[in-house]
Amino acid sequence: MYKRQVPEYSNEDKAICYGITGGVAKYLSMIDPRKSIDENIIRLFFRTDGYLYDETRNLLTQEFSDIAVVNNIVEQIASGENTLNTIAGKIGEKEQTVLYSLDKLINVGLVEKKKCITEEKNKKKTQYVLKDYMFKFWYEFIPKATSVIEMGQGEVYYERAVKPVLHSFMGSVFEEMCRYYTLMKGITGEYGCFITSVGTWWGVENIADKNGNIRAQSADIDVVALSDIDKRAVIGECKFKNEKIDKGIYETLIRRGSLITAKYKISKYIFFSLSGYTDWFETLSDENVLLLTLDSLYE
């Protein structure tokens, strides 16, 4: 999976490599290990002769006849619209038309249904997300840069508009990597229970402000691994950022764990960080908390 990358690269660059190719062997073979990850991204995506510059258009044209509708749907999902009614509303199509195209996109592996892991039968908690990371990267950055790339200024665009937000793009990729890692460890019983499924959770939590007033706010948990045999759960928070994880992030995950404890007892709280942890964690003594880094995923 994510480990099948360019061995010469650092683990951070390996992860980014996975994020822009989805781990597809064909695309990985085009990465030149003698060049930096930035040089490879520019060469493949941000030049008119780059192989991946036109790859998404070519693949969609081969698979779909209603290319305009499909393209609009994928653009909306890439921009963050993830429910049937919002996608249909944004592109001005009937929900049945959009659903038909979504089903085809799912069948060819470009889109998947994402469900809240503790409420998988709740249709209202279904989101559509891009499953293919190469498509996700392309749709997030290339369409708005086409004119600049065709003027031969793709490298400038990448340096100014893409590279500064590359870690942000990698956020959801890193979360998926961490879920996979958690499942692989969990099926061996490493967390004190036998993990049978992994996913994510989202919903609403009630927060008290400094005056004691209660307000509702949206909440999510990046990694939720469940043991339906033991009725236990492992939950995690993932940060692919240059900043270290601090006490506030720790407290948020601990608090949000209470949102699923009606059904499952929390066995472990796992933190995954690209850049490590603040000094506060040196004083933390809790055997139920695991502090991992990106390097942990590649061991």
Give each language-model segment a name.
Residues 91-108:
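Short amphipathic alpha-helical interaction segments
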Residues 1-5:
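Conserved small/polar residues in nucleotide/adenosyl-binding loops
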Residues 6-59:
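Amphipathic alpha-helical "lid/sensor" segments that cap RecA-like P-loop NTPase cores
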Residues 106-117:
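A short, conserved structural fragment
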Residues 37-89:
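Winged-helix-like regulatory helical subdomains adjacent to P-loop NTPase cores
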